């Protein structure tokens, strides 16, 4: 993993990435490709949904040939099985998300028949922002539970402003 900043903010990322596909595919694949493939169990999609990421799409208007950029929340990209809020003239050019702070708790999990070289049966990720003993913000996502990668808005809203306890 080349990014020192990502290693700093996501100390478990290298181990988590070992669960994604195989070494040759990881070396050839792209984050954008993982998103626009629209697999309901895409590991990196679930990871970045929990980061409440926004993507930037660059496109060309067909008639006027004018170039444009538009921003789409990753959670709004998926409209149905393999259906995206993205035209054939658009490409994904960047991904934006807030870096975790010292008050951030983040976890990604993947369940599959084999530990390595296997697609997920189900996967999930959660990002919590904690202030004292209260969850100030929550973002939860899951794959393998619907025809699209799911940002769990109701679960996220339910957790926000809840106290943290050992129970």
Regions found by a protein language model. Give the residues of each.
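C-terminal structural segment of proteins
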Residues: 1-167
